[in-house]
Amino acid sequence: MTDKPCELCDSPGGDLLWRDGFCRIVLVDDPDYSGLCRVVLERHVKEMTDLEPAERTRLMKAVFATEAVLRALLDPDKVNLASLGNVTAHLHWHVIPRHQRDRHFPGPIWAEPTRADAPQRPAPDRDALSAALKRRLD
């Protein structure tokens, strides 16, 4: 690792929805992708294979719970799961609700936009997201 500060060690990385000491789930403020969440490991680890098998399972349980909650509450056409870490080498997963008319569909959200006239979606009810995550994970 470098001596560069880690933004996910130094800040929550979004609006905190759920936390258990092992990982946290945050809602990211992204006007193009309403409901985009991150599942962030609490300690600084770079890769999934740096975790013990039981820890991998525990982290993915949080990722899958986040996907299920977003599907139930937001009814997206698709949900993308991504763990890149090229910019922030701190293990985290993006859980991204997608709609056929979003700016980048069907490409990844980091690609060039495929349309300029994508409709804005209302912000999700953060309290409903948080409560649904607690029901699934606590």
Enumerate the predicted regions with their spans.
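HIT superfamily nucleotide-processing domains
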Residues: M1-D138
